[in-house]
Each structure stands twice: as structure tokens, then as C-alpha cells.
């Protein structure tokens, strides 16, 4: 990943790729904490300059992968913009629906880390109201999971975790409450 990052430095129009490479290198080298502030500044700068980021699948992927890196307050602004844009998510292609669902699942994890319960409800509702198709079932389940976690529904948490443990046990190991 470091070699790719260095090769990308030669391209003036590859800023999005450079940011993604830096993010990958930081994660693989287990240096996310050390580079968080610098990466966050680069991401903020990029999003502020690029008005089309909400329509760009690569930028949406970067947002989904960097929710724990971006400054919390700036991230809240980005998430609110996405929530407004994608209110009628069923009108978008399936890939976009999945990507936005994944972004909001990652964001709910950040909200949990920050104990930002008041901010969580609208993202939980979004996930729970995704179209009822198999490809979005996991995101809907994660909405149920975070609903139970944030709003202390022990029975709902036990039921949702039971399903998640059978379907995606590796994901359960990374969840905040098991």
C-alpha cells in the first residue's frame, strides 16, 4: 500500500486516490490515531472543494471507510447532507442504496463511541425504512441493533444479536455491545 501511495504522488489529478491510499496505509500500519488529524484535514479540504461528492461512488466509499477519522462535527454535517439527499433512497440504484446504508451503519458506530444518542434516531429510522429486499437486510438488521443499543431495549438487542451471530458472526465481534 505504501508503494501505491508513493506512485500516486506523481499524478496531479489523483487526490481522491492519494487520500484513499493514505487511509489504507494508516489502517494497515495500525497508525490511524497518529495520522487521524492530518487525514481528517485532507478529507475536510477535499469535501469542501468538491460539490459533487454526494454523487461520486468513490467519494461515498471513502466517507464510509473514514467515519472514524473525519472530525466529528464535520462528519455530522456530511451525514446530514447525505440524509437529506437520499431521503427517497428507493429511487436510487441498488449499489447506492447499499453504500448509503453502510455509511450510516458506520456512522451509528461513531455516534455510539461519542455517546450521541440524540443524533442517532434519524439514521436508525433511515436504516429500518430501507426497502425490504435481501441485499439490504443486513443494514436493516444493523438499524435494529443500534436502536436496541441506543434506547436500551434488552429483549430487542438479544433477538437481533441472535440473528446477527448466526448470519455474520465476524461482524458481531466488532460491535460495541454483544
Functional labels for PLM-detected ranges:
Residues 1-44:
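Charged, helix-prone or intrinsically disordered regulatory segments positioned adjacent to compact structured domains
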Residues 1-4, 32-42, 72-84, 114-125:
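Helix-turn-helix repeat elements of alpha-solenoid scaffolds
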Residues 5-15, 44-56, 81-97, 125-137, ...:
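Solenoid-like repeat scaffolds
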Residues 13-23, 54-62, 98-105, 136-142:
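Generic helix N-cap/helix-start motif at coil->alpha-helix transitions
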Residues 19-31, 63-68, 104-111, 141-148:
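Conserved small-residue packing positions in alpha-helical repeats and bundles
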Residues 70, 112-115, 152-155:
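Residue-level detector of the short coil/turn that links helix A to helix B
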Residues 104-143:
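Intrinsically disordered, low-complexity segments enriched in Gly and acidic/Ser/Thr residues
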Residues 149-178:
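C-terminal non-catalytic interaction modules
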Amino acid at each position: 500500500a505504501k508503494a501505491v501511495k508513493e506512485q500516486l504522488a506523481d499524478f496531479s489529478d489523483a487526490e481522491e486516490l492519494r487520500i484513499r491510499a493514505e487511509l489504507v496505509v494508516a489502517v494497515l500500519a495500525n497508525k490511524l490515531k497518529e495520522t487521524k488529524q492530518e487525514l481528517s484535514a485532507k478529507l475536510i479540504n477535499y469535501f469542501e472543494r468538491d460539490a459533487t461528492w454526494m454523487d461520486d461512488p468513490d467519494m461515498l466509499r471513502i466517507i464510509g471507510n473514514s467515519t472514524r477519522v473525519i472530525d466529528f462535527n464535520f462528519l455530522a454535517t456530511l451525514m446530514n447532507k447525505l440524509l437529506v439527499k437520499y431521503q427517497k433512497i428507493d429511487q436510487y440504484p441498488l449499489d447506492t442504496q447499499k453504500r448509503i446504508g453502510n455509511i450510516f451503519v458506520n456512522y451509528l458506530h461513531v455516534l455510539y463511541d461519542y455517546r450521541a444518542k440524540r443524533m442517532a434516531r434519524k439514521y436508525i429510522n433511515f436504516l429500518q425504512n430501507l426497502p425490504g429486499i435481501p441485499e439490504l437486510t443486513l443494514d436493516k438488521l444493523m438499524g435494529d441493533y443500534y436502536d436496541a443499543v441506543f434506547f436500551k431495549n434488552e429483549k430487542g438487542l438479544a433477538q437481533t444479536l441472535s440473528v446477527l451471530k448466526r448470519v455474520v458472526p465476524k461482524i458481531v465481534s466488532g460491535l460495541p455491545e454483544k
